[in-house]
Amino acid sequence: NSNAKKALATCLFRTDGYKESLELYDSILEEEKNNTDIYLSKGHLYKTSGDIDKAISSYKKCYEIDRYFGDSYWSLANLKTYKFTDKEIKNLTKMVLDENVSKNEKIFMHFALGKAFEDLKDYQSSFNNYHLANKLKKESSLFKYQDYIDDCNNQKTVCTKDLFSTKNEWGFTSDEPIFI
């Protein structure tokens, strides 16, 4: 079952079992040759293990399979050392204007363009793309600032000095920090 293999590969990757994880990813790709999520995961694995050239190849394989796979461009940008080619920038610029490209993919693409233009020292274009990415991301976010403020105010109302004084004897008495 490829879903079980994907889950196991992810667990192995997160626990430094890179070799075993890579073997599982490759076995999945034998069955699903165009699975962009697996190539993306392989790219992340290579990045984490320090093999940046293979990470770049894996990320590029994603957009060779699906040119609209925005996470591949964002992952390249997130390497911090990758420089987009003029052709990649041109293609990304066209795709973010395409009404058929999903909002989520455009978010990734705008972030990638932000980094690409920043590297070119075209700071206005960089800012514009970062701004658009953040705007689109905010529109799709479930986070509501007012809800956060209301929650904080509610905690202030409930967690009074009186509440804590009634619970003064509770808990552990050591002043040592607890790391969770």
Segments and roles (model prediction):
Residues 1-180:
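Alpha-helical solenoid repeat scaffolds of the TPR/TPR-like class and their adjacent stem/linker regions
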